Amino acid sequence: MTQHTQTPSMPSPLWQYWRGLSGWNFYFLVKFGLLWAGYLNFHPLLNLVFMAFLLMPIPKYRLHRLRHWIAIPVGFALFWHDTWLPGPQSIMSQGTQVAEFSSGYLLDLIARFINWQMIGAIFVLLVAWLFLSQWIRVTVFVVAIMVWLNVLTLTGPVFTLWPAGQPTDTVTTTGGNAAATVATAGDKPVIGDMPAQTAPPTTANLNAWLNTFYAAEEKRKTTFPAQLPPDAQPFDLLVINICSLSWSDVEAAGLMSHPLWSHFDILFKHFNSGTSYSGPAAIRLLRASCGQPSHTRLYQPANNECYLFDNLAKLGFTQHLMMDHNGEFGGFLKEVRENGGMQSELMNQSGLPTALLSFDGSPVYDDLAVLNRWLTGEEREANSRSATFFNLLPLHDGNHFPGVSKTADYKIRAQKLFDELDAFFTELEKSGRKVMVVVVPEHGGALKGDRMQISGLRDIPSPSITNVPAGVKFFGMKAPHEGAPIDINQPSSYLAISELVVRAVDGKLFTEDSVNWNKLTSNLPQTAPVSENANAVVIQYQGKPYVRLNGGDWVPYPQ
């Protein structure tokens, strides 16, 4: 009888279980394409780790399939993390406000996210991958590209993954007519009101520069007089705070040549709103008498000398508050009172005609009617001083005409608002009242989207959103300004507005035979373009914009 000895089977070498990326090849190819087009804030190391997780050989086929199921939510989260879309913190913080949007507005926002050209390009990529994968091991090329992208992060402190030669339409922060002051914040030089930008734009250097900026801003303020001189002339100050209006929006709407702009005495060409949301913008304006604080500091008590309207109240200016809306959305009115220091009663809105319905369905009143009510009310208080804060909402995204669910065309609304302001200016000129009108938009409406954000999305305060058309006009002057407006081309912000108010606060320029406009507008405080929301910061450094999301690394803002 023959005995057969059975030798135990040897386990297969681990290398036999390398299965490639399979369908995940397409996932990474889509990312590479979006990265090249500038649509991603790509994180090379995280993606390399995810790829290694997918490639790791697993002998048991069931565990291999389970890995793919686990990878689906991980891959989705990583893809979201690699985009410029709002993060979980931002979505949660804005969630209650989004819930108040009308259904029509929500559908409109969803439709804007659909990019048919991008969908077409992804479809072509899918067909190409399916076709070529019959003969080519695509995994090899995908892994090679991923390794190359990670190597790039090690070749230097700063690099860009976007195609070279992209233009920037930013402002170079040069001195112009500003005072050539030199101060220090710690051991960092601050030249011409702004920290020097000499170091290379690494994350460490940009963080250090931003800290220097805020340290320098803490020391800046405009000083109001303790009292007005006996020969001071009473006048009214009207501050008009317009939501969703930037120079980019004006240009996109084709309204750069509207007569309203020639009506101003002073126009700021590079005024930075510092944020892209209404509440923070209003707080910054109401605290205009001090330097620019960080977003977090906005919701902490400020020095009493920072509140513009309180400074005016100490000099005898009666405070007034007007809105063309109820101020309830997002707790706007509450923020204005608690953080902006505006405690005046809201002007009576009864009987005002409704011009629009807001994105949350609440009424937006006719602005000319609101302004005329203010003018009528102030006429009953002749020879007095007043300071009025007027916040208006007609240009906000999602506003629609009564009875129509579709968002009203921005240009139609902007044309109407500009016509109304122009007509109001004409009426003020006829009235002969001494009035200083200051127009400071909150932020832009993002009428034109970019590679980071679709039209209407303002989670990231990009330069096109925060560069707003601020202007000043004096009425009732004995020697009014003639000719084209005086352009302020230096980078400016709210401190410059407070400085202009201080220079005019005694009202003497209304009765002077000749006004020294050069003295009035020269050496206004400059402010470096720094814009911030809760989860995003955008700065201009060495003439180029950089963005930091959720406290991460700085990257060039894609143009």
From Swiss-Prot:
Keywords: Cell membrane, Cellulose biosynthesis, Membrane, Transmembrane, Transmembrane helix
Predominant place of localization: membrane
GO cellular component: plasma membrane
Entry membrane topology: Multi-pass membrane protein
Biological process, per Gene Ontology: cellulose biosynthetic process
Location in the cell: Cell membrane
Domain of life of the source: Bacteria
Spans through the membrane: 34-54, 68-88, 113-133, 139-159
Record's function text: Required for cellulose biosynthesis.
Full protein name: Cellulose biosynthesis protein BcsG
Species this chain originates from: Salmonella typhimurium (strain LT2 / SGSC1412 / ATCC 700720)
